[in-house]
């Protein structure tokens, strides 16, 4: 009983997206499993919209996700985890591929591969906003429900995509990630959970995870 109250025994289901698969995520999971070997951990890949529904229903205990709209966030608790700079994902043969960094206005004539807004509204709206601030409205070549699909579409020559720099782990040999030099060309990653479903195991996990966050 005492071990349960200390969060050393139990189960934990963690939601994540492909945007949360940088080096920090495996490190957190490994550290938590090392310290709490009697906690059964389940990992579930989801889109940000799916995270919201799963947290509210109690299907998952915690999620690495994007900030929610204020109306959706009323029942959730958030902690900022890191700010992820955007990179432009493009073919190695692209004229801009060899540049050390670019401004988003240099992509004004490109077709954009975007996240499906129904699944990732924060990221979609951020890209649209960045383009508007640069003086243009992006030509949307295609949308995808996942970063892996976006990268596949770029590889197929369907356009360019803006993805967080941690997505570098996904790129193939034919693609490059070029950093964006624009101010505010980034998107936040948060840890979210539902206070009404909070338990000792969740608190133990938050203690481990939040020690590894990057402050804004």
Where are these predicted regions, by residue range?
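Short loop->beta-strand "edge-of-pocket" segments that line small-molecule binding or catalytic clefts
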Residues: 15, 86, 95, 102-122, ...
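Beta-alpha-beta core module
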Residues: 72-79, 84, 89, 148-195
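Extended ligand-binding regions for polar small-molecule ligands
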Residues: 105, 188-216
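Secondary-structure junction motif
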Residues: 110-134, 199-207, 216
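Acidic, Gly/Pro-rich loop/turn segments at junctions of secondary structure
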Residues: 35, 46-109, 167-171
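Hydrophobic hinge/microswitch elements
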Residues: 47-60, 66, 117-176
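Alpha-helical linker/hinge and terminal dimerization helices associated
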Residues: 1-5
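Central regulatory/effector-binding core of bacterial HTH transcription factors
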Residues: 9-71, 144
């Amino acid at each position: 009983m005492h071990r349960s109250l200390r969060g050393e025994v139990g189960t934990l289901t963690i939601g994540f997206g492909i945007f949360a698969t940088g080096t920090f995520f495996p490190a957190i999971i490994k550290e938590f499993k090392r310290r709490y070997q009697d906690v059964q951990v389940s990992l579930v890949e989801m889109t940000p919209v799916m995270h919201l529904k799963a947290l509210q229903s109690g299907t998952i205990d915690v999620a690495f996700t994007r900030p929610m709209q204020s109306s959706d966030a009323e029942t959730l608790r958030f902690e900022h985890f890191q700010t992820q700079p955007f990179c432009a994902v493009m073919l190695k043969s692209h004229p801009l591929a060899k540049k050390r960094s670019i401004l988003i206005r240099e992509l004004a004539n490109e077709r954009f591969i975007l996240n499906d807004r129904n699944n990732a509204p924060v990221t979609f709206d951020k890209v649209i906003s960045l383009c508007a601030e640069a003086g243009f409205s992006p030509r949307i070549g295609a949308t995808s429900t996942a970063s892996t699909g976006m990268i596949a579409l770029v590889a197929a020559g369907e356009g360019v995509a803006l993805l967080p720099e941690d997505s570098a782990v996904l790129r193939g040999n034919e693609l490059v990630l070029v950093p964006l030099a624009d101010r505010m060309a980034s998107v936040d990653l948060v840890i979210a959970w539902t206070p009404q479903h909070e338990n000792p195991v969740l608190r133990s996990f938050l203690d481990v995870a939040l020690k590894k966050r990057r402050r804004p």
